[in-house]
């Protein structure tokens, strides 16, 4: 009997081993098949390499925002977003757009450019001007540019104005709304919710905290914003009027003049666009395709020979000289925050590390720091500025290229460079500092919630449920005043200005690049190309490569990112994308204000940030 049980046990043991073997084998087989499937999709599952027919038009069909640096999309967020049907939004890196236009200018297969910009959102004028520079270079080569559109928003029309001919749909129009700076204000709301806002600041024009303590824009903030908005709009109008050979007044009518003009064409925006000289011809899609087919040759799909911007980029070859030295490009784009941060945010430790990497690289002979930031953490700004100073002390030239925005903390990280180059429409300055602390003791008490206890120091009981004592408030204000004095002292030392001279142009006031030059805050008016040329000149370089220093992705992250692009996995849901377009600007502004209170992470809570520098 014992032998029988032993035999039965051996049989069951053998069966269990067999089941385990089959289970593991199937699991491993599924895993290997998954790897093989991913490999096949990644390397063979996408379309063949795009080809450029000769001759062809390059269609600049930009979809999505123009950015300084592309973001890394977290794969887990992407997978979660796919459940909601959200697609990956395209991002167009400014320098890629310009490089592509310049590459096409010298490509014999490309005989013209078609601007099809209906999916390009409103974009800052400084970035548009850099693209426009490349469009002018393309035209100078003798190749034509045509703009096509059913309806042009302001940014789309700005680029379209550089075309040789602008087409508009018969039921379309051109809407030029000008520039503005409007904010939401929450003082009364916070009072109704019994939220106490403690504000500490230095600077008459430091208006970042106004939404929390006022119900309207202060006169000082209105004065400052009116000045730089007028300059930006004037630059827009002058550029377009010059391109279209029309009177600038045409682009800046009063409401009465606009209504009178619209009435003269029975409310037809397309007819008004023709009458004012904003466009050249009204054409349906069929008429447009026929005309472009005559210019570039007909294709088999009742259209014209063309290749899209995204397909064309895949055909471009890098022009890289392995024997040449490098000029390193470090991008600081976004709000400045402490520590390591992903792309889209300027991490103090992240950007400082990239600058240090460039400083220690013997092949790098000069550095261009590209700044597009409204500022943020004062502590993180100083971490980056210290590394800029270390680069300068090492003997390697460092030039700052200011993009659309280099204000407050964005100016802080720039001021120690060997040379600062801004465009006329750059917004910079905003030299000031503040702190905001919200406490809820009144609201809690109304709800019947109270805080009580003991502590070992006068600061032990300070918190969101107890409020701030008079002494704590005084300590915060003294710290802010010290931070402001340090800020303007650094500006004075680095810009060779007296403290009085700095204080007169500081106080949180925003300046355009043109005004900043007059006040000694920048050295030169120019764009990114000028900054690179200046860095090369200072380093005595004739031949060089541009080396974009970025936080490296791991091999796994690189693979996942490229794989996601191929299989079109979608990204995480953005609440703004769910809202109607008319509500998205309001949601964006509320999100920005909330992040000011919740997400900023300066160790001391001191911020050099420009909230009112967003142009609408």
Q: What positions do the PLM features span?
A:
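Cleft-lining beta-strand/loop regions that shape enzyme active-site pockets
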Residues: 49-51, 56-183, 319-443
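N-terminal Lys/Arg-rich, disordered targeting/topogenic segments
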Residues: 1-22
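Charged, glycine-interspersed solvent-exposed loop segments at helix/strand-loop junctions
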Residues: 183, 187-291, 441-535, 539, ...
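Extracytoplasmic and endomembrane cell-envelope/extracellular-matrix remodeling and assembly machinery
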Residues: 267, 288-329, 384, 561
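Short alpha-helical segments and helix-capping/turn motifs at coil-helix boundaries
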Residues: 38-46, 97-99, 313-315
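Hydrophobic membrane-insertion alpha-helices, especially the h-region
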Residues: 23-42
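C-terminal intrinsically disordered, low-complexity extensions immediately downstream
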Residues: 530-562
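Intrinsic disorder and flexible/low-complexity segments
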Residues: 2, 80, 322-327, 331-363, ...
């Amino acid at each position: 009997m014992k032998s029988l049980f032993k035999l039965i046990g051996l049989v069951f043991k053998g069966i269990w081993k067999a089941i385990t073997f089959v289970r593991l084998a199937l699991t491993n087989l599924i895993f290997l098949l998954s790897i093989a499937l991913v490999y096949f999709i990644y390397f063979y599952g996408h379309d063949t390499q795009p080809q450029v027919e000769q001759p062809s038009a390059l269609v600049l069909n930009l979809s999505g925002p123009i950015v300084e640096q592309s973001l890394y999309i977290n794969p887990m967020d992407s997978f979660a977003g796919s459940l909601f049907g959200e697609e990956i939004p395209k991002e167009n890196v400014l320098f890629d757009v310009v490089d592509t236009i310049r590459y096409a200018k010298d490509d014999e297969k490309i005989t013209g450019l078609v601007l099809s910009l209906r999916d390009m959102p409103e974009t800052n004028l400084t970035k548009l001007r850099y693209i426009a520079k490349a469009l002018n270079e393309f035209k100078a080569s003798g190749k034509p540019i045509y703009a096509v559109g059913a309806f042009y928003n302001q940014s789309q029309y700005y680029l379209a104005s550089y075309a040789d001919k602008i087409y508009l749909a018969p039921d379309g129009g051109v809407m030029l709304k000008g520039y503005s700076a409007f904010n939401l204000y929450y003082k009364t709301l916070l009072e109704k919710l019994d939220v106490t806002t403690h504000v500490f600041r230095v600077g008459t024009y430091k208006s970042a905290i106004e939404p929390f303590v006022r119900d309207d824009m202060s006169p000082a903030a209105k004065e400052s914003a009116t000045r730089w908005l007028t300059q930006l709009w004037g630059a827009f109008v002058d550029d377009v009027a010059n391109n279209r050979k029309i009177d600038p007044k045409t682009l800046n009518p009063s409401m009465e003049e606009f209504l009178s003009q619209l009435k003269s064409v029975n409310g037809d925006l397309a007819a008004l666009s023709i009458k004012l000289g904003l466009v050249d011809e009204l054409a349906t899609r069929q008429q447009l395709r026929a005309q472009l087919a005559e210019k570039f040759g007909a294709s088999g799909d009742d259209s014209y020979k063309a290749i899209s911007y995204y397909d064309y980029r895949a055909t471009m070859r890098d022009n890289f000289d392995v024997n040449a030295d490098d000029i390193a490009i470090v991008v600081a784009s976004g709000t400045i925050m402490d520590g390591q941060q992903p792309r889209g945010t300027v991490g103090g430790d992240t950007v400082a590390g990239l600058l240090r990497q460039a400083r220690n690289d013997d092949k790098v002979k000069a550095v261009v720091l590209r700044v597009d930031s409204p500022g943020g953490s004062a502590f993180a700004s100083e971490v980056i500025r210290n590394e800029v100073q270390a680069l300068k002390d090492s003997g390697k030239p460092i030039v700052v290229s200011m993009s659309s925005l280099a204000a407050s903390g964005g100016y802080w990280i720039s001021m120690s460079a060997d040379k600062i180059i801004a465009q006329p429409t750059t917004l910079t300055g905003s030299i000031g500092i503040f702190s905001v602390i919200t406490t809820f003791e009144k609201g809690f008490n109304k709800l019947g919630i109270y805080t009580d206890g003991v502590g070992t120091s006068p600061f032990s009981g300070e918190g969101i449920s107890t409020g701030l004592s008079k002494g704590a408030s005084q300590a915060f204000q003294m710290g802010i005043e010290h931070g402001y004095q340090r800020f303007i002292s650094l500006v004075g030392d680095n810009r060779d200005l007296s403290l009085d001279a700095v204080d007169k142009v500081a106080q949180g006031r925003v300046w355009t690049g043109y005004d900043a030059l007059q006040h000694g805050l920048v050295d030169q008016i120019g764009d990114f190309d000028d900054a690179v040329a200046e860095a090369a000149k200072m380093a005595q370089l004739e031949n060089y490569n541009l080396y974009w220093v970025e936080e490296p992705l791991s091999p796994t992250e690189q693979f996942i990112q490229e794989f996601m692009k191929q299989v079109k996995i979608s990204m995480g849901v953005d609440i703004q994308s769910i809202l109607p377009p008319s509500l998205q600007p309001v949601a964006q502004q509320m999100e920005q204000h909330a992040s000011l209170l919740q997400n900023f992470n300066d160790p001391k809570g001191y911020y050099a940030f420009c909230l009112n520098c967003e142009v609408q």
